[in-house]
Amino acid sequence: MLERLKDSLIRSPIIKRGEYNYFIHPISDGVPSIDPHLVEEISDYISEIADMNVDTILTVEAMGIPVANALSLKTGIPLTIVRKRPYFLEGEVELSQSTGYSKGVLYINGLKKGDRIIIVDDVISTGGTLLALVRALQTIGVEVMDVISVIGRGDGYLKLRELGVEPKILVTIDVGEKGVEIKDVFGNQ
């Protein structure tokens, strides 16, 4: 189960950013090259475990796009991308997000009250982006049926529980100076 993903995570190079051990992986960083078989493995697994009775697959620009797009192609469900710049379309919703390493503004377009969506993200660590996104979607009246993160690091996912959302994290990891350690795989509980 998710053997390509687990193997690729274990082989991820680690760099230091200050005191932070940062793993470099195709799903979270786009480097090295993104293996289409890896993306296929991930999207196949998501389609099996997620509530796919939705109107739209939603992801945040940029690194959630490869997996969310593969899932959209596999299921025929449209894909909506939350962007980092405004388009000034009618109904555009602006939200501020803050993570452990950045702050910014995101823009949601094309969703309306009553839409049922699944969120697909590459990594959840602090939970800042997903927390702001889910709050904004709930304010609009969009039903968040599922939140999927390919990789989980830390306990930021716990913040989503406060909003009544239980994210599904495919692979939970720890990152140390010596490398990535697989802590859990969704479905092994």
Curated annotation (Swiss-Prot):
Annotated pathway: Purine metabolism; IMP biosynthesis via salvage pathway; IMP from hypoxanthine: step 1/1
Entry keyword set: Cytoplasm, Glycosyltransferase, Purine salvage, Transferase
Subcellular location: Cytoplasm
A Gene Ontology BP annotation from the UniProt entry: purine ribonucleoside salvage
GO cellular component, one term: cytoplasm
Disulfide bonds: none
Quaternary structure and partners: Homodimer.
UniProt-listed HAMAP family: Hypx_phosphoribosyltr (MF_01467)
Name this polypeptide is given: Hypoxanthine/guanine phosphoribosyltransferase
Species of origin: Methanosarcina mazei (strain ATCC BAA-159 / DSM 3647 / Goe1 / Go1 / JCM 11833 / OCM 88)
Gene (UniProt): hpt
